[in-house]
Amino acid sequence: MRTVLINGRVLTGDGLRDDVAVVLDGDRIADVVDTASALDAERVDLGGGTLLPGFIDTQVNGGGGVLFNDEPTVEGVAAIAAAHRRFGTTGFLPTLISDDLDVIDRAMRAVEAAIEQGVPGVLGIHIEGPYLSARRRGIHSLDRLRDLDEEGLALLTSLKRGRTLVTVAPEAAPPAMISRLAAAGVVVAIGHTNAGYDEARRALDAGATGVTHLFNAMSQLGNREPGVVGAALDDPNCWCGLIVDGRHVHDATLKIALRARPWTASCWSPTPCPRWA
């Protein structure tokens, strides 16, 4: 049975439009048509609301009263998914900050099980640490940080279902390790790092493809040393995460970054998600 969604602001390839209707065929979008030519079908009035595709969030530390580090279980993943689904997030990576290897292992197995059991929206896992710089650790516990070794490499490449995104500092994960992660299908991002421009470039050349929360917990753009920020903005193939909560990054800084790397350059914008989200 076909249904037509009318009287809404619909995001299309041409921006937000209020002169189109969305045609549904069962649970699938069949067409987007001019409102005037909408089919004779059951109509749902959106009341002037905005209709958007579901959001995909690559950095979700928790939600629904659950912090993933505290509850690396299928139940924890499901609670986080349900909490964020209410706000339009239909796909996400449960994100673990620096922790012991056994906790990382439990989290990865929980994500595998969640995908197997059909928990909606789970796309894989984001492992943010423990292979980070002590100088730029932020809230990550110093006693959890370590250099990437063979044991860690084996763990990070062990996910059987979904995608693995890891955030590493080049100081703790040298180019050879980054290359091996990338070769195994792991998406590697640079973050929580005090690396200079040249070291960051070597990491990108080795297989890192992005930067986690650009500007935060990393070396900054300077006149003689461009830092990680400069390396990220200078590389057209590097995606950039941004925390756009009005606190982590100044509005002017955000605008400058978006001018330097427009949306066509695949700039991601995850936001932090505390346990009470």
Would you name each region that the model predicts?
Residues 1-6, 10-52:
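Histidine-rich, glycine-flanked metal-binding segment
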Residues 60, 170-171, 193, 245, ...:
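Active-site metal-binding loops of divalent metal-dependent hydrolases
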Residues 199-277:
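Active-site-adjacent C-terminal substructures of enzyme catalytic domains
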